[in-house]
Regions:
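Catalytic cores and adjacent binding grooves of peptidoglycan-active enzymes
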Residues: 59-144
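Extended, low-complexity, intrinsically disordered C-terminal regulatory tails
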Residues: 23-52
């Protein structure tokens, strides 16, 4: 069974309890790494200036304390393997729905690769979107 390393545990501990419960459940079956939980002002502005965020501090979901957003990468990490991210996101979102249905978490979860939600009952994985839409494949956030 995979386990989180020290850095992943530290990052996840900065997140809302729903994200902690969700990803502590996910790691039992899928190896992954938590790269970012809470972002302070300096880290958020770096993310914005590098194009990794559309939000200035304190507007990002990573900026709340505890954070209502988390960036998690499936192993092995391959930034060019979109299929792996889609598969991982499907797993995470399915686990989130199950945990919410049984009352272990209270919030819905949105994935950063699908800001537009379901269209005709299908997740839109196309990359033919407006350039204003950030495809943030490792990003998961709570819908409160």
């Amino acid at each position: 069974m995979p386990k989180f390393g020290t850095r992943s545990k530290e990052q996840l501990a900065t997140c809302h309890i729903d994200l902690q419960v969700l990803f502590n459940t996910v790691i039992e079956e899928i190896d992954c790494s938590v790269v970012c939980g809470h972002r302070n002002e300096e880290d958020q502005e770096k993310a914005f200036n590098s194009g990794n965020s559309k939000a200035h501090y304190p507007e990002g979901k990573h900026n709340s304390n505890p954070s209502t957003a988390v960036d998690v990468y499936p192993y092995p990490i391959d930034f060019n393997d979109n299929e792996r991210y889609f598969w991982f996101a499907g797993w995470v979102l399915a686990k989130a729905k199950i945990l919410r249905n049984v009352g272990e978490i209270t919030n819905k979860v949105r994935w950063g690769g699908n800001w537009d939600g379901l269209k005709n009952g299908v997740i839109d994985f196309s990359y033919n979107r407006s350039p204003k839409v950030l495809n943030d494949l490792p990003h998961f956030e709570l819908i409160q």
